[in-house]
Structure formats: C-alpha cells, structure tokens
Amino acid sequence: MEDQLIPIGIHMNPNEFIMSSYGVRMPRIIYGTAWKKDNTAALVEQAISLGFRGIDTACQPKHYNEAGVGDGVVACQVRGIERSELYLQSKFTPLSGQDPERIPYDAKASLAEQVAQSFQTSLRNLKTTYLDCLILHSPLTNQQKMGEVWQAMENIFESGGTKQLGISNCYNLEQFKLLYRNAKIKPAVIQNRFYDKTQYDGTLRDFCQQQGIIYQSFWTLTANPNILAHTTIKTLTAKYQRSTAQVFFRYLSQSNIIPLTGTTSETHMREDLAIIDFELTADECEAVGRLL
C-alpha cells in the first residue's frame, strides 16, 4: 500500500482548519472509522497518508475497532507524522449503546468510573496520552445520570486528558441547552446525523453558532440522496468540475459545519480532501441551503 501513498510529511494548509472555542485546531473534514472492523488500521493509515488530520472513533467495540485506529495512527507516526498534527476524538458510549458481550468497562461500576475506565481504554487503544476531544456518544435518559457522566468528563478535561468535550446524537434543543447551562466545562462540539427528519438541526445549529459550538455532521451523504441529485447541485458540479459529494461538503464547510466521511475508497478520500480547493459564492451557498 505504501507505494500508492503521497509523502507522509505533507502538512495541511491553515485554511483547512477551524479553531474551536477552546483553542483547539480542528480539520474542516474528519475521517470517521465506524464499521471498518479488521480494515480499520489500513484505512486510517491510508486516510492520514493522503492528508486527513482528523480521526473520529469511539470506545464501542460494537461498531468501532478503536485499537485498529491506534495501529493506523502509529504506522503514520513511524513514517513522520507528529501526534500534534492530528486531531483525535473518541467517545464514551453508555451501556445502552454497547454490545453486552464486549463492554469496554465494568458495567457494575459507577457512571463516573465507567467514564474513567472507558477513557483509559481509549488512550491505550489509540496509543496516546491525551485526546483532542472526548464526546458523550448519546444523551442519557435520566438528567441526573447525564450530569454524573458530564462531570466525570469534566474531571478528565481538568486533569489534561482531553482538550475539549462534546456530545453526539443530541437532537433535542432544550436538552442540549440544559446541558450547556449546567456544564462547568461547556461542550465545544456537537456531532449529529444530518438529515431531513430533524430538519437538519436548524434551530440547534443556530444555537451552536450563537455560542461558538462546532457542529459536526455524519451520515451526511447517505441520508441525503435527494439533495445530491437535485439540479442545484448538478449545476454546481458542472460549473466547478467537482463531484456532488464535493459540492455538498464544500457548502457545509463554508457554513462552518465539519462533515465526517467514512469512505473506504482512495479516490473518494482524495476528493473529500480537495473540497478546500474551490469556493462557492454566497448566492450558491444560499441556493444549496434552500434544499435543507
């Protein structure tokens, strides 16, 4: 595989990053590692070698091979990539999201201890001493439990274990506002499925913009075939000689949304990274935005 990779020492342009409210430099597109199983290490190595600097994973053996992510990262570090060049984010997944046969922490422990154990497992898997972001994989049903988990994550932040915190799969604006109000360490990131059933999180994204919270999107292409097939997108693909995915990702990037891409195709990896090579006009962004 190495013969097909570009020189590993390549550095991303500063324009390819966005700065979070905690001063963390986040790539404008992130490589997602769910459902890659035994191919995880090779795909992560390939993604980083081609230019990705952001990697998303989770301490959830049900859907992620987190240790494989670590192996892919280490392979790139051996070839010259510094840890400081990478943005690594992982997640604490509550029991409800775990495979009962492969829980990566003591299911009988307190919530705080579950978070701590999961975090330490992530560090071991990823072979790192810190995370750039620790994300709560999904809200807990009970507000008290939610508070316990978030406080445990705050403890990790305050000890220097992670540079910022976030939450995923949180589609209820009032629930998110409550977390934001109660949190000592405010969420810097929210990562949600981006699709029409939630009206593309319009009001939630407005709140995020007001508070300086970075919105990350997943299932961005899979959930939106109608948008990708729309004449508005097709017209822009012809004008810029880009793929439909590139046009949509570029629109999101110019809207300060960081999309995740989980492609296993080298061609698509290169195309996804190339979204920084062109720019839509304000009118074009408005036209794409009307499709949401």
Task: For each feature predicted by the language model, list its residue ranges.
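N-terminal binding-site loop/beta-alpha segment at the start of enzyme catalytic domains
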Residues: 2-86, 90, 223
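Acidic (Asp/Glu)-rich catalytic clusters
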Residues: 20-21, 46-49, 70-83, 87, ...
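Structural motif corresponding to the early beta-alpha repeats
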Residues: 83-112, 137
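A structural motif
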Residues: 52, 128-131, 162, 187
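Active-site groove signature of glycoside hydrolases
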Residues: 123-143
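Beta/alpha (TIM)-barrel catalytic core signal, keyed to glycine-rich beta->alpha loops juxtaposed to Asp/Glu
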Residues: 138-292
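Short, acidic/polar
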Residues: 36-48, 108-126, 173-177, 199-201
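Active-site mouth loops of central-metabolism enzymes
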Residues: 27-39, 100-113, 142-143
